[in-house]
Amino acid sequence: MEKPAVANHPHAALPPAPGADRHHCLDFADTAATLPAGQSYDLLAAPDSAMRWLATHDLTTPDVQLYEVCAQRMRTLRGHVRALFAARVEGVAPPEESLRAVNQALTAVPSAPLLAWDGAQGLRRVQAHPTDQAVNHALATIAADAADLLTGPDADLLAACGSAPCDRFLLRTHGRRHWCSTRCGDRARAARAYARRNDTSE
């Protein structure tokens, strides 16, 4: 389900896919993809790059230490989110294991501080999970956003990029747009023009 990482991410030259500004889960799903030229990238391939992605999206603070086990958990959830997106786009039933994985992420942390009592301070609100479990909070936030996207009005706009082999996801924010970037759109149009020229020359 996961793709190998490359040293120099071609993703750096690509803008976020349409809709990523409204849904972090869309950008999360697109942290691994194959682009039209056949290049692949994985922005969660290592703890440092995974940490940068979380910090860039305000899902944690730069002082949090991220380990490989945490990056692996992020990659695993990403695979399940991508599977749910693909099922929605294809109009088929989602994989049960992916539903379970997203629900587990959703319930891994409380949605609000709990009520606690101690003799010195009396009643107060406390977080049930310490700050060293910041990844749990980040994954819960991503899972909640994915659930909101898949069950909300934007679900009908969810699409896979139509410029094979690119497999990024996007929201069709403008008409019938089916490309995740201008680069993919230009490539698809060029391929169609080339095919038409070949047809007329035969």
Predicted region positions:
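Short helix-coil boundary/hinge micro-motifs
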Residues: 1-160, 168-169, 200-202
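A broad detector of short, well-ordered amphipathic alpha-helices
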Residues: 144, 188-191
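Cys/His-rich microdomains that often coordinate metals
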Residues: 165-170, 188
